[in-house]
Amino acid sequence: MAKDDVIEVEGKVVDTMPNAMFTVELENGHQILATVSGKIRKNYIRILAGDRVTVEMSPYDLTRGRITYRFK
């Protein structure tokens, strides 16, 4: 998948699940299942419920995403 094809949206973490999975509520009200990107995992950045995050989504599956940034 090319980098141009991703959809970036902001959302809020609603729930944490096992295996570094999170339920994220997007700005438009939809809820998706998101996982943590490699750089966040590598740098041990903690993500908790209530955090604002940026999520990358594939245009082919709009129910899953990858958390790429946690706002301070």
Swiss-Prot record:
Keyword field contains Lipid biosynthesis: no
Residue pairs linked by disulfide bridges in the UniProt entry: none
Species name: Streptococcus pneumoniae serotype 4 (strain ATCC BAA-334 / TIGR4)
Major localization class: cytoplasm
Origin: domain of life: Bacteria
Family: Belongs to the IF-1 family.
SMART domains: S1
Keywords: Cytoplasm, Initiation factor, Protein biosynthesis, RNA-binding, rRNA-binding
GO MF, any single term: ribosome binding
Protein localization: Cytoplasm
GO cellular component, one term: cytosol
Coiled-coil region(s): none
Keyword rRNA-binding found: yes
Self-association state and partner proteins as the record states: Component of the 30S ribosomal translation pre-initiation complex which assembles on the 30S ribosome in the order IF-2 and IF-3, IF-1 and N-formylmethionyl-tRNA(fMet); mRNA recruitment can occur at any time during PIC assembly.
Function of the molecule: One of the essential components for the initiation of protein synthesis. Stabilizes the binding of IF-2 and IF-3 on the 30S subunit to which N-formylmethionyl-tRNA(fMet) subsequently binds. Helps modulate mRNA selection, yielding the 30S pre-initiation complex (PIC). Upon addition of the 50S ribosomal subunit IF-1, IF-2 and IF-3 are released leaving the mature 70S translation initiation complex.
InterPro entries: NA-bd_OB-fold, RNA-binding_domain_S1_IF1, S1_domain, TIF_IF1
Domain S1-like: 1-72
The protein, known as: Translation initiation factor IF-1
